[in-house]
From Swiss-Prot:
Pathway: Amino-acid degradation; L-arginine degradation via AST pathway; L-glutamate and succinate from L-arginine: step 5/5. It comes from Vibrio parahaemolyticus serotype O3:K6 (strain RIMD 2210633). This is Succinylglutamate desuccinylase. GO terms for biological process: arginine catabolic process to glutamate; arginine catabolic process to succinate. The active site is at residue 219. Transforms N(2)-succinylglutamate into succinate and glutamate. Zn(2+) binds at residues 63, 66, 155. Gene3D superfamilies: Zn peptidases. Belongs to the AspA/AstE family. Succinylglutamate desuccinylase subfamily. InterPro entries: AspA/AstE_fam (IPR050178), AstE_AspA_cat (IPR055438), Aste_AspA_hybrid_dom (IPR007036), SuccinylGlu_desuccinylase (IPR016681).
Amino acid sequence: MTKSLFRQSFLTDTLDVHIDVAPAEQVLSNGVQLKLYQRGVLEVIPENPTQETKNIIISCGIHGDETAPMELVDSIIKDIESGFQKVDARCLFIIAHPESTLAHTRFLEENLNRLFDEKEHEPTKELAIADTLKLLVRDFYQDTEPKTRWHLDLHCAIRGSKHYTFAVSPKTRHPVRSKALVDFLDSAHIEAVLLSNSPSSTFSWYSAENYSAQALTMELGRVARIGENALDRLTAFDLALRNLIAEAQPEHLSKPCIKYRVSRTIVRLHDDFDFMFDDNVENFTSFVHGEVFGHDGDKPLMAKNDNEAIVFPNRHVAIGQRAALMVCEVKTRFEEGELVYD
């Protein structure tokens, strides 16, 4: 048996800051190639890649305390090493912020998932990570066809949700809402997808905007520590991800996800800002038209549509940052292979 690249596993080695992680390569008996570039960054190359081969970035740990995706990724890589998991797609697995994971916190100095725009930012540990990730994305997608590029950025929600799993599709100037991507969501039993209506500064948006990748930010359950995640509730997602890596057709039934459009973004403008609900309110809590749910200065925050729902509410953000998304359920269709809505 070929000696493993890892002392214990991809995840365990990534989080063991007492050992050095040097670049290393390995070719498995089935011809699959593994390339460990640095701590938390592993490329997996199928035996016979072509120009049609999917090139998939599977990232997790952008927020250090969101650990369920790390456990799923670690299990998949173990099965790739053993030969149990078939590999027909070229993949880049990323555990982005091990130091934050070890501290059991989302970030150390600044929210990493708000640093992927082209604005000037103050130097922080997270900014250095974002700069490194941008280079990894550039190098991974180099000399590949745009239609083959995917990026699944895996997260967990910090609060309860009416939808245990959901995804956010970034808004870009490119066609990045393909039928294949929606089919993947349905196969993974992701309960809902939010269709963003404006650019953002997230990791998945960066890949979609700059490299035309089929990209999603995926929220998989609730934040928990390693070993305490309810992975049994993510079985369909795990199967769908494994099928994507193997370029295999799913054997289980799909479940169509609910589509939401982002009706507006609430940005905090004043020191005097608050919501009328507590911090435990669930994502996708809805309001009736005209219902007031907070204030920003002397301006009331109210629902502008019936059943308008709130996602990612955070009263503690700095002035100028997003305090919530407001979303409405929407009917969609495909035009020329792309998901659209009126």
